[in-house]
């Protein structure tokens, strides 16, 4: 509102503002007016003791290209296993994440990659490069913790493949994964999804994340600080127990994590 009022005072209004979630794109036929908008926006934010993020603010004379984020453009260039083998495609995804860490595009990319891994024509390649694929997906999870559930879900799908019958081999590989993740710091979110992937396999692992300990039923400490809540309310809620864990649901989970379980939104 403050920006709109300031612009009405300082410019002729041939501006069009397009908003998508928390992204704003401002269009005009006059580049000088756009520069004036940026200057006005700086001034408005300054009055509020705020500043414009220069790294996320761009000026362009190409509305067709620059309306897309750089990670979106890069994702469109990614080859698929139709032109590459499965292993090379996995490496190309890893390279994408190194250039665009925690990109929202990674969710869509990995969902499509998961579908291709299930195709019969790729069965031989998947079995041939099984440990390498698991290792790459582990690296993707470490580099992109915001979306770690996606590579971990695919790892669970690989470990569930009946074409790899050696259970001891898969158990050893799962343990190597756990050991590799535990070398990292601040992995609470990863541990939650790693526990989900391993729970139905019977693999016993001691995770540090408090939620994981509640699932294991080994945590006697309150999960939340409720010292400020009146006792009358505390008596009505299961705040200091593991009653919020659905034990029946835990008994029904499978080692194979479906993408529907982790995809809250439809990525495109």
List the predicted regions and their residue ranges.
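Active-site palm subdomain of RNA-directed nucleic acid polymerases
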Residues: 1-22, 26-29, 33-36, 161-166
């Amino acid at each position: 509102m403050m920006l709109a009022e300031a612009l009405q005072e300082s410019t002729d209004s041939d501006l069009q503002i397009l908003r998508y979630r928390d992204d704003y794109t401002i269009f005009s036929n006059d580049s000088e007016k756009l520069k004036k908008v940026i200057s006005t926006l700086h001034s408005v934010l300054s009055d509020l003791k705020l500043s414009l993020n220069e790294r996320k603010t761009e000026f362009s004379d190409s509305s067709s290209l620059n309306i897309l984020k750089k990670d979106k453009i890069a994702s469109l260039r990614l080859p698929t296993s139709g032109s590459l083998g499965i292993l090379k495609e996995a490496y190309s995804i890893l390279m994408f994440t190194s250039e665009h860490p925690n990109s929202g595009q990674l969710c869509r990319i990995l969902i499509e990659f998961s579908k291709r891994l299930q195709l019969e024509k790729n069965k031989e390649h998947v079995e041939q490069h099984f440990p390498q694929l698991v290792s790459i997906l582990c690296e993707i999870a470490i580099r992109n913790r915001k979306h770690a559930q996606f590579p971990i879900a695919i790892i669970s799908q690989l470990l569930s493949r009946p074409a790899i019958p050696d259970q001891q081999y898969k158990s050893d590989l799962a343990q190597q994964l756990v050991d590799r993740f535990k070398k990292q710091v601040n992995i609470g979110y990863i541990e939650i999804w790693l526990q989900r992937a391993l729970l139905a396999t019977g693999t016993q692992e001691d995770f540090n994340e408090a939620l994981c300990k509640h699932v294991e039923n080994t945590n006697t400490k309150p999960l939340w600080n409720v010292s400020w809540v009146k006792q009358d309310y505390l008596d009505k809620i299961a705040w200091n127990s593991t009653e919020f864990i659905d034990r029946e649901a835990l008994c029904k989970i499978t080692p194979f994590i479906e993408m529907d379980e982790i995809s809250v939104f439809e990525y495109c």
